[in-house]
């Protein structure tokens, strides 16, 4: 199947520009052997390349390109399929934008085309060419430094509850996972994540439960989360708990129960965040919305967890605006390498900024992911790069320090 792949990257500062023609000559021979053709644009600092050919060969060559130390900030913009090649003259043809007038350069690029139809802007792949040549999207291109530009040093602040303080009859426990602002070295909140024992009643598969049992167990388990938060002496830190959306609907006294447990553990509603997962079906939305009103009227904040991973997404956001959203790890992973993920996350940030909704990123695992997200405007993060969730305690936090 004929595959089209487009990426952009940044040449290393210490890489001689004069060697680019030699590099292209080698790539041309290699690509032709794999039945891959394409064109490489260069503007003095950035590469923009289109590859066309059999899917496996294109992806094999792209993997090799990603390992090439002569460039960095490699971002895949497009991987699509087409009936015919657009640029089929050579395995790799270099087009130096610096040698052409700005007004003429696009037509000069199109003149390189080999399609039997004249290349036009209706072609999605060629719209990427226009954007690169005219530099109309520079504000969305973030040049992040190498991953080894930062050290992450644990602060030794971990704490664990004495096992004697935990009742042996308790079936569920909680792990606490911090949400942090790394550059200001500030803890935003601790998320209490339930850890279920295999023999726990609340660990029984949903299909094996009696009607309503899952929601009762979901609600009642939060009493332990508040008890542990109090025992860990989290002070005035925000505490985030997770609820199934339908728990608020099926448990009529859910809000009163939460408020009573918050008070019993010397906490205040204003430091509590209730998270709902976007992917859960909210079949009785009006009743859910009424329960949300009660939560917010009591001072409790509301967040959508795993935003972007479910099917409700923007429709849910149009009907219900939380105080916070947490962008799903599925969108965060390798965001520094993926043009589509970058565009989606930037759109989420812009939308939430317009609605004054705070945004955090979850599942951040690498320095590159964090640096790109910081550049995009996100300040709050959760993930193993900074700290892993700690069972019955709070973990040390690895704060970034510039080398």
Swiss-Prot record:
GO terms for molecular function: blue light photoreceptor activity; cyclic-guanylate-specific phosphodiesterase activity; DNA-binding transcription factor binding; FAD binding; flavin adenine dinucleotide binding. CDD domains: EAL. One of its GO terms (biological process) is response to blue light. Signal peptide: none annotated. Residues 98-144 are annotated as: Joining helix. Its cofactor is FAD. Binds 1 FAD per subunit, non-covalently bound to the BLUF domain. Disruption phenotype: Reduces expression of ycgZ in the presence but not the absence of BluR. At 16 degrees Celsius, reduces expression of genes (including ycgZ) for several small proteins. While the BluR/F system is induced at low temperatures under blue light irradiation, it is not essential for growth under these conditions. Keywords: Chromophore, FAD, Flavoprotein, Photoreceptor protein, Receptor, Sensory transduction. One of its GO terms (cellular component) is plasma membrane. The keyword Flavoprotein applies. Residues 2-93 form the BLUF domain. Monomer, it undergoes transient dimerization following photoexcitation or upon temperature reduction, with a relaxation time of about 2 minutes. The dimer may be the inactive state. Interacts with the N- and C-terminal domains of BluR. Can also interact with the C-terminal domain of MlrA. The joining helix is required for stability of the light-adapted state. This is Blue light- and temperature-regulated antirepressor BluF. The gene is bluF.
